[in-house]
């Protein structure tokens, strides 16, 4: 996967799994198997060895980068003769549906908050910034859910701008995967974290590839370090179908679930519906909007079979 892409060869240093794991440099493992169980997503197989080989070196890299940014901030404050200004370091995590962005974000949050330089690490997903279900239906965007135009980008940019500017309390809307909708009158409060992890499909997008107004700022303008979780599309489709089957047995069985009508499908019926959703919505969104932003990331995590990381690509 890595050797066939000339752009990646030009822009990135490529590490095989074993090479990357050596960069851990004795960073202690602070997660137990029980901790990891709480962090895993549906159909995710991330193990303690995956944490040790991939995520501990990454947390060490991010710690060094954040410390450097903090030290630079102190130098600027001294030069300008002003009181220290607290601006959260913002990490974005992008990638396709079913690639495991959420698990990556949760594991990184758990590891990064153990470093003394940045103990307060918040995690926000962009799902909450999807337009409410009623608005999507009214705009004719229900079959485009997850595409850039299905997000309230003005609200998302205002949120990330407020966090970056050091606002003491900033509200983020909460999304329910049961009702398939934004939760009314409930918010996540972000209160001046040391690090904010922002996870979502389109967080690497810029005005170059936006189908909407390009004159306004984009989320990527506020991000300090960006990560793209990558995999071949054939694997992504397979993982999406497997996850759909898991949801059918779990979340879809809830009578309140928007997808409750899928709960009694046979395996063959569920696989066919999941494949169609991929081919008509998730696949085109990946090809048109998500994958083209991949080479903007500072770091690419490449997955192979069984969700295992095979390579790490780091910007030169």
From Swiss-Prot:
MF (Gene Ontology): ATP binding; pantothenate kinase activity
Localisation: Cytoplasm
Keyword Transferase found: yes
InterPro entries reported for this sequence: P-loop_NTPase, PanK, PRK/URK
Cellular component GO terms held in the UniProt record: cytoplasm
Pfam families: PRK
GO biological process, one term: coenzyme A biosynthetic process
Origin superkingdom: Bacteria
Keywords of the record: ATP-binding, Coenzyme A biosynthesis, Cytoplasm, Kinase, Nucleotide-binding, Transferase
SUPFAM superfamilies to which the protein is assigned, alphabetical: P-loop containing nucleoside triphosphate hydrolases
Positions contributing to ATP binding: 95-102
Reactions catalysed, as given in the entry: (R)-pantothenate + ATP = (R)-4'-phosphopantothenate + ADP + H(+)
EC number: 2.7.1.33
Gene3D superfamilies: P-loop containing nucleotide triphosphate hydrolases
Pathway(s) this gene product operates in, as recorded in its UniProt entry: Cofactor biosynthesis; coenzyme A biosynthesis; CoA from (R)-pantothenate: step 1/5
Leading EC class: transferase
Annotated family: Belongs to the prokaryotic pantothenate kinase family.
Protein name as annotated: Pantothenate kinase
Encoding gene, per UniProt annotation: coaA
